[in-house]
Amino acid sequence: MTLCVGVIATTRRATLGTTKTRAVTAPGVIELGDESDDQVVWKRLGQQGVDKACELWSAVNSEAAAAAKGAWAGVKPAHKVFLSDILASPKRNAFVRKWIETDVTYASFIGVMHLGCLLAPFTFTWGAFKCFLAMYFITGCLGITLSYHRQLSHKSFRTPKWLEYTLAYCGALAVQGDPLEWASSHRHHHQHTDTPKDPHTPYEGFWWSHMGWLLDNEATIERVGDRSNAQELAAQPFYRFMEKTYMWHIAASAVALYAIGGLPWLIWGFCVRTVWVYHITWAVNSVSHCWGSQEFNTGDLSRNNWPIGILAFGEGWHNNHHAFEFSARHGLRWWQFDMTWMVICVLKFLRLADKVKLPKEAQMERMRFAPAGGASA
C-alpha cells in the first residue's frame, strides 16, 4: 500500500471489537487511532475446528484467538498437511484431492532441492562454503528482506531505480517467486493477518503456515490471486519482464555456479543455500507467529523471536514489524540485531537510500502493552 501525505489508509482487524485507522500525517509518519463504534462482524463455520483453535491458542493470545473465532465463513478450507494439527481448522485430505500443475511443480522443485542437500557432506570444500555464505547474504538479506519485503512490499525506503532493480533481481535468485508475486502475496498477508484469508495463517496449522500453503495453490490462489494490490509494480516493464522470464534466471544462476565451482558450488551455493533461505523465510511466517514475545498490541499472533531475528537478518522481530509495517527498522531496541537495517543505514550514508520510514517514540508508546497492573499508554 503506497503511503503518501494526505492519504488515509484504513485496515480492519478484529481486536477487541475495534477497527484501527492508520493515517499518514507526514512522510513516513503514521498515527494510529481506534473507531470504537465500528464493530467487526464474524460469521461462524466449522465450529469444532474453530473451538479447537481458540482453546489451544488461548494460553498465548486469547484476544487474537477470540477474534478469529468463526471467521471461516465463505473461505474454502485448505488441504490437510502432514503434522498440521498443532493448530488447525477442518481440512480436506491432501492425498485424495486433485493436485494442480503448480502444486506438482512446487513440490517437485522443493523436493529436489532437499535431496540435493544430501550430497552436501560429500561435496564440502571451504570455497563451496564461502559461496553458500555469499549467496545466503545476497539472496536472503539483499534480495528477500531488503528488496522484496521492506522496499517492494512496504515501501519503507527508496533507492535509485537501477539499485531497486538490482536488489529485486537478487530476490528472484532466492527462488521464492518473482517480485510482483511475492510483494502482492505479502500485502495480502498484512491485510488479513492470522485470519482465513491470510495465505499462511497459523490457524490452518503450523506446517501450513510454514510451507504447506505453497503446495496447495487451489486454496492459496483464492486468497492471494488478486494482484491488483501491487499495480505500481505491475506498471513497470522490469517487473513484468521478471514475471514472464523468472525461471530462466533461476536456471541461469544454477548453470553459472556449476560453471564456476563445479558440483560443490552447485550443491552448496544453490541447493543448500536455497533450502536454508527457504526455511529461514518460512520460519518468519510460522515460528514468529507461534513462539516469542509481544511488546506491541497488534491484535494478531505475531511474535518477536530472537533466533529468527538473527538468522533472517532482522525479520524475526515480527511483532515490531506488524505493529509498524511501514518501518524500515524491525529491531526497534538497541539489542534487537537487525542486519537489514544496518544495510539500509549504509545505503543512506552513501546517499543511495532516502525517504526512510521509522515509527516515532509516541507511536510506539501508544501501541505497547500496558505493564502488568498499569494503565495503557
Task: Name every feature range the model reports, one short phrase each.
Residues 230-237, 291-317, 321-324:
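Active-site-proximal inter-transmembrane loops
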Residues 2-282, 327-377:
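Non-catalytic, topology-defining segments of multipass membrane proteins
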Residues 158, 207, 290-296:
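Short alpha-helical linear motifs
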